[in-house]
Amino acid sequence: MSDAVAAPAPAESGRTPPILEVRGASKLFGPVRALDNVSISLDEGQVLGLLGDNGAGKSTLIKAITGVHRLDAGRIYIDGHPADIRSPNDARALGIEAVYQDLALFDNLGVVSNLYLGNELTKPRWLRALGWLDRKAMETEARRKLDSLQVHLPSFSSSVGLMSGGQRQAVAVARAVAFATRVLILDEPTAALGVRETRNVLDTIAELPRRYNVSIVLISHNMDHVVEVCDKAVVMRQGGVVGEVVPTAETMEEMVSLIVGARTHKEE
């Protein structure tokens, strides 16, 4: 059993604690301060846009949340409980899944193996790791999950390394969507997708909080996508948070200004 969750943190009176909260996160890579006292919160059923130019600290932050990096200072809370996330397995035990820009796929494996790596179905189910791989069940479920995203692949038997960038992206998104039970983190999920696949991913992002009660952190440079699906947006620059905005067509210019450093909330 994972020991990722410790004792509950004090919650504000009468307020349900955020499903995910980061307080005072700092991270150094040698002399480079990748994160500088970053605090964000994600409420249950919410879609949070995490915005910023390249090098703003977004990827470092989400890799700290998912156990890839360890914070030098600050804490991560899940449902108000301090979470000691030491590895991606700890994050998964807490229901957190992520799709990174590098996709983290195994090019020499097929679609089904990539979708279920570390979450293999076995028979009998109660034996778990001691059972036999239920390849038929995994393929059936993989087809159902990809069909729900309207992703059509030329062959399930082909290795992922032979697929197009858009097909690989779709497999990575489908894997994360399939196993996220609390928080889904998506780092530029539509970057390599065509128009139809992009539409399907955006529809899935909008649907997940309502249908499955999964909260989402979306990293995107596409302001139109942020306005369409996000409930709030946090803007990062040079490792710190410089503003929080409710994304609408009217606030799009404000978000861009925060990203490029033309203004900060402190100036208002």
Per-region residue spans from a language model:
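Glycine-rich phosphate-binding loops of nucleotide-dependent enzymes
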Residues: 2-268
